């Protein structure tokens, strides 16, 4: 087990891979501490969750190639990563920052703050759908599409035609999938299109994507974050088409809203935006 933050020795193991993993684990710890102080915005929270998933996967793979005696958990690597940062930033592992004290849980086992184990920090507050602010729905000339008992090919073609006729600027697109007289899911998309000199239109930003179940309850909500900004012209239509195809797969019974929401969120690595109850449904 890694020692606490006052230890001066850094044991990063052989090779750059161990050093990199440990350093990124230290970055994750910093993100989590900032989050525990409620000082991390939503894009930052997204990056925290992505980094944690990436590290967990990478550590699992890397440990398979290491002897059992050298395998380390994410928490152990966090401790090493934090110590690496202290050396890199201050060139003195015992150096402190004036006016700053590490966060410490005040309990009987950790009453002495300088000697407490830095891994004892509160869990990151959970984010549920209602915690996320969204842009207003006011968009000029919103487009609504109702797909009634269409086969997949016709449904996708109708959506594609509507998307391609959007003007430059912000738009709102509402999609209702009605299969065998069952309104299974309603999807609201807000975004911004750019019109290029050659006449080509691309989606520059996906501001929001909401999915509602049969009772009108919001089951998935995506809002403007760094992850939802389209990086190149082709991405806009690719993202929309992949989402629309997901919604318009043929089903003989109502689509499970929660399952579909998870599918939508996974397009952006945003599964954590579902509350625990919604994720389990």
From Swiss-Prot:
UniProt-annotated stretches for the region RNA-binding and homodimerization: 1-93
List the SUPFAM superfamilies hit by this protein, alphabetically.
Answer: S15/NS1 RNA-binding domain
Any GO CC annotation of this UniProt entry: host cell nucleus
BP GO annotations: symbiont-mediated suppression of host ISG15-protein conjugation; symbiont-mediated suppression of host PKR/eIFalpha signaling; symbiont-mediated suppression of host type I interferon-mediated signaling pathway
Coarse class of the primary localization is host cell
Q: Where in the cell is it found?
A: Host cytoplasm; Host nucleus
Region G1P2-binding: start-end pairs: 1-103
| MF GO annotations | protein serine/threonine kinase inhibitor activity; RNA binding
Q: Where do we find the motif Nuclear localization signal here?
A: 50-55
Function noted in UniProt: Binds and inhibits the conjugation of the ubiquitin-like G1P2/ISG15 protein to its target proteins. Since G1P2/ISG15 is an early antiviral protein, NS1 may inhibit the host antiviral response. Prevents EIF2AK2/PKR activation, either by binding double strand RNA or by interacting directly with EIF2AK2/PKR. Also binds poly(A) and U6 snRNA.
- Stated name of the protein: Non-structural protein 1
* Record organism: Influenza B virus (strain B/Ann Arbor/1/1966 [cold-adapted])
Gene assigned in the entry: NS
């Amino acid at each position: 087990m890694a020692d606490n933050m006052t230890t001066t020795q850094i044991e990063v193991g052989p090779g750059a891979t161990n050093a990199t993993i440990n350093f990124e684990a230290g970055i994750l710890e910093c993100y989590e501490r900032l989050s525990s102080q409620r000082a991390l915005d939503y894009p930052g929270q997204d990056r925290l969750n992505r980094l944690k998933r990436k590290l967990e996967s990478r550590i699992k793979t890397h440990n398979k190639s290491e002897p059992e005696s050298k395998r380390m958990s994410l928490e152990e690597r966090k401790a090493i990563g934090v110590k690496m940062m202290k050396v890199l930033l201050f060139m003195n592992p015992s150096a402190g920052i004036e006016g700053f004290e590490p966060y410490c849980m005040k309990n009987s086992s950790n009453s002495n703050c300088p000697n407490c184990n830095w891994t004892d920090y509160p869990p990151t507050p959970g984010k549920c759908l209602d915690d996320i602010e969204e842009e207003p729905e006011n968009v000029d000339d919103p487009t609504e599409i109702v797909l009634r008992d269409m086969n997949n090919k016709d449904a996708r073609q109708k959506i594609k035609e509507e998307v391609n006729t959007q003007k430059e600027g912000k738009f709102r697109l509402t999609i209702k999938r009605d299969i065998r007289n069952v309104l299974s899911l309603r999807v609201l998309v807000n975004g911004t299109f750019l019109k290029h000199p050659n006449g080509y239109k691309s989606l520059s930003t996906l501001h929001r994507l909401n999915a509602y179940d049969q009772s009108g309850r919001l089951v998935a909500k995506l809002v403007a974050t760094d992850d939802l900004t389209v990086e190149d012209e082709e991405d806009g239509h690719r993202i929309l088409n992949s989402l629309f195809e997901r919604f318009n797969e043929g089903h003989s019974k109502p689509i499970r809203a929660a399952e579909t929401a998870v599918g939508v969120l996974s397009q952006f690595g945003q599964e954590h935006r579902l509350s625990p109850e919604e994720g389990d449904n």
